[in-house]
Amino acid sequence: MVKKNKIKIKLNGKVKYVNKGANLYSLINKLNFPLNKIAIEKNNLIVEKKKIKKISLKPNDKIEIVHFIGGG
């Protein structure tokens, strides 16, 4: 059973529960993604990195995070 202080989102196609009031920055920080090596999409819209601290997560949001890895 999910606690009342959590909301359900989809992260990269998988269901994830996050705290109510969480923002995109807190999610990325919790997942340990380096901001300079990711692209973020929320509900099919690209998110500017400078705005992620202001973007709240809401129930049923679809978040896609792409992590870039260098190689040769």
What is the role of each PLM region?
Residues 1-71:
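Ubiquitin-like/PB1-type beta-grasp interaction modules and other compact soluble beta-rich domains
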